Amino acid sequence: QRMESWLHKQVAKDVANSQHSRKTTLELGAGTLNQLKYEPAFHPYDIVEPFTDLYKNSPLLERVRNIYSDCSAVPSGSRYDRITSVATLEHVCNLPEVVARSGLLLAENGVFRASIPSEGTLFWALGWKMTTGLEFRLKHGLDYGLLMKHEHVNTAREIEEVLEYFFEEVRCKVFGLTKSISLYRYYECRNPVVARCSEFSNEKNP
């Protein structure tokens, strides 16, 4: 839990200062709304989350302005200062479409902020096998790796390649020593390549 909090804190770092806490936000894959614990309580916050059971009983739901079941459902005229995701991009089957649409939904000087596990690296595999994987096998007698193969459809490298295709500026920070020797990564993306985003999402940017 303590290590996983790194994922949340990196994404929320830009609004830690009250001067920037009014930024409009769209969170992709908001799940149980646990990222809201790290976010200011009074800035406009929209979410994309297809599974209503994850958040419907959350006491944090009152802080959410708009809820969308899919990124494509967000009105094309909407603009956000920040679009965020925490341990979500590795699960997204249509990742290029989602990132392209996000690029079009960013306001001028907006930032796409995403934290992910270092999926696809030996260090990450060893990490979960010795913790969650071991616990899962002892409790259920099943191989957690099979579940991971179905859940994590994108590696960290694949995610980075998609981000670099749709954004001119992509910065990466790791929870570890290097990209290959890390448990988690945080990406900060600026200046979307609008032509590529529009072409891939079949949407013209107004």
Regions inferred by a protein language model and the residue ranges of each:
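S-adenosyl-L-methionine-dependent methyltransferase catalytic module, highlighting the catalytic core
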Residues: R2-S5, S72, C93-A107, V111-F200
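Conserved SAM-binding loop
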Residues: Q10-W124, Y186-P192
